A protein has these predicted regions:
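Short, charged interaction patches at domain edges and termini
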Residues: 1-17, 57-65, 69-73, 117-151
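Hydrophobic alpha-helical segments of small multi-pass membrane proteins
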Residues: 77-79, 113, 143
Length: 151
């Protein structure tokens, strides 16, 4: 199985375990995790869902034996696309004020931590949030890596 597909399965498993948390407002959906590309007919804003896209970036030989790579460092990219209404919340705090997402604390970091703890993926670069003017979505991008040993 390819790296992006393995990550897709792992992230899907995390979502299935955690999506009942009321904080996620039904915006986390295991069917909205994609590897390689998002189908053209999928629009996170219309679905009011968070879309997660995984891509493979590189495989770099790291350890050689008998003139053959025995280990490679795999790098993958994970992007989180948020529906443009995800900053509004029907949830209220004790004072009746709306509770908003902290994208990193509530969604991205727990998923990245899960991938690190379960499969040994380490975050290399990424984070920060940007706004896509074409889709009117907030998104973030992370690169993660791990060693793949063939011995």
């Amino acid at each position: 199985m390819a790296i992006a597909e393995e990550l897709q399965q792992d992230i899907t498993a995390w979502i299935l375990k955690n999506k009942s948390n009321p904080l996620f407002l039904d915006e986390l959906d295991e069917e909205q995790v994609y590897s390689y590309g998002v189908p053209k007919d999928v629009n996170g804003n219309k679905l009011n869902k968070i879309i997660i896209l995984i891509r493979e970036i590189s495989l770099q030989p790291n350890l050689y034996g008998s003139n053959h790579a025995q280990e490679e460092v795999a790098t993958a990219q994970i992007q989180f696309f948020y529906p443009n209404e995800s900053d509004t919340s029907p949830l209220k705090d004790d004072n009746g004020n709306p509770v908003y997402y902290d994208y990193y604390r509530d969604i991205e970091k727990p998923i990245l931590d899960y991938l690190h703890d379960k499969e040994g993926w380490s975050r290399t670069i990424g984070g920060g949030h940007d706004f896509d003017p074409d889709t009117e979505q907030v998104y973030s991008t992370y690169h993660i890596k791990k060693s793949v040993n063939y011995l």
